[in-house]
Amino acid sequence: MSDIALTVSVLALVAVVGLWIGNIKVRGVGFGIGGVLFGGIIVGHFVDQAGVTLSGDMLHFIQEFGLILFVYTIGIQVGPGFFASLRVSGLRLNLFAVLIVIMGGLVTAILHKIFAIPLPVVLGIFSGAVTNTPALGAGQQILRDLGTPVDLVDQMGMSYAMAYPFGICGILLTMWLMRLIFRVNVEAEAQKHESSLANGHSLIQTMNIRVENPNLNNMAIQDVPILNSDKIICSRLKRDDTLMVPSPGTIIQAGDLLHLVGQSTDLHNAQLVIGKEVDTSLSTRGTDLRVERVVVTNEKVLGKRIRDLHFKERYDVVISRLNRAGVELVASSDASLQFGDILNLVGRPASIDAVANVVGNAQQKLQQVQMLPVFIGIGLGVLLGSIPLFVPGFPVALKLGLAGGPLIMALILGRIGSIGKLYWFMPPSANLALRELGIVLFLAVVGLKSGGDFVDTLTQGEGLSWIGYGIFITAIPLITVGLLARIFAKMNYLTLCGMLAGSMTDPPALAFANNLHATSGAAALSYATVYPLVMFLRIITPQLLAVIFWGMG
């Protein structure tokens, strides 16, 4: 058997063993995709014992390409919501998550200085303790740039594997500890979260208002400032028994019922100006109007603003809401359409069908992957990651590397959505498949390289000490920030659990947090809010630590 065939066969065996290990769960918690690392260690141990030689160049390529696939697909997935998560609504959550990252770096620096832990080992412990695989890849690359011998770079994967198990368990123990210390009633926390959403800025809501302000009588909708803003959409108007789709030029009269869509604060402000909120239904049922959701798939409308498409003037149809990457938005006239956007249309059936034809509404296109943008994005990401950033006093130029470059480029492209006929939308199933493939390839190679010396290091070397260092790096930041967030910020427990899981970019921890309450989405929401920024910082942190420690040493 050729070296290439043998290498591929061994990698396939690693993936099978590792995924089987990952599926084993104890009390609902398992290693998940991280099991591939341990599958690689097991197979690597026996491969080393048997004296089998694998293709080093091929393993190196597969490891790096797997990492690129993984971080690129993550960036494409979270890109549309990344910049929104940095705004005020998620600022507090992101600040606490950043504090966890910074504290983890400080604890790592202190341990490195006090116990003189070798640089590759301490970076591996750091990456494993925070359960972040791209951090491992970024750390290994910067070590190679610094001229570290290959055998020492491979030690990083071994120390990563030592610290990884408690990284998984430590965050779950922290969630349990917070619940115990503060005697949390999970059901009550879920209800509080739902109440805060209803009163906050997080959800798009509707309100039916009767026009009672005499100053608005016989005024056009476009002449009423609160209705002519991009914060409120008036999607239906009922006069006597007639329900209609209003246009900017529609004259409103006292007694008209307006169906408004927007965020709760803006709706409340509109109600103060217009009149009184009423419970009267403005349903399209039994009328010649209907409400339908259509998806944007036509390349000709990508990047165009809603106002430039003139749907109201041409078809008598109003876009009441816009759903992008799972986030409900007010369909402001300045909003540009992106591939995969879901539009909530209100109008007559024939008119809605006409608008659906304009925007595409081809559901099958959502299941197709444009491969050209994928490779353009990966290529640009690798180029971005290769740009050297010279910092005075540092021995080598900093780079975003093969982990950071594709991630940043994917975040940007995911946010842009499309350029001409190229669109960076990727069906969730395809994104997940590429992401899982990438991380399996990466972890399989890391495990194989670490497996030869793993058992000896654990039983006869410093393996137990590495595990102890990892416990400190995992536990101190999580417990400290958890206490601060709960005591001083009065953070909701479910939100706190999601934030802690997101700060460790740890899907098993998110699964555990989601299972705390069957119906609440609090944990998933806070996880998604902090995940993009934390992932970026987790990739940059080991590079900064490596360069700083190298300069100090």
Swiss-Prot record:
Residues 192-276, 279-361 form the RCK C-terminal domain. It comes from the Bacteria. The chain crosses the membrane at residues 4-24, 28-48, 65-85, 95-115, 158-178, 371-391, 393-413, 437-457, 464-484, 493-513, 533-553. It is a multi-pass membrane protein. Keywords: Cell membrane, Membrane, Repeat, Transmembrane, Transmembrane helix, Transport. InterPro entries: AAE_transporter, RCK_C, RCK_C_sf, Transpt_YidE_put, YidE_YbjL. One of its GO terms (molecular function) is monoatomic cation transmembrane transporter activity. It holds the Pfam family TrkA_C. Its main location: membrane. GO terms for biological process: potassium ion transport. It is found in: Cell membrane. GO terms for cellular component: plasma membrane. The keyword Transport applies. SUPFAM superfamilies: TrkA C-terminal domain-like (SSF116726). NCBIfam families: PRK03818.1, YidE_YbjL_dupl. Belongs to the AAE transporter (TC 2.A.81) family. YidE subfamily. This is Putative transport protein YidE. It comes from Salmonella typhimurium (strain LT2 / SGSC1412 / ATCC 700720).
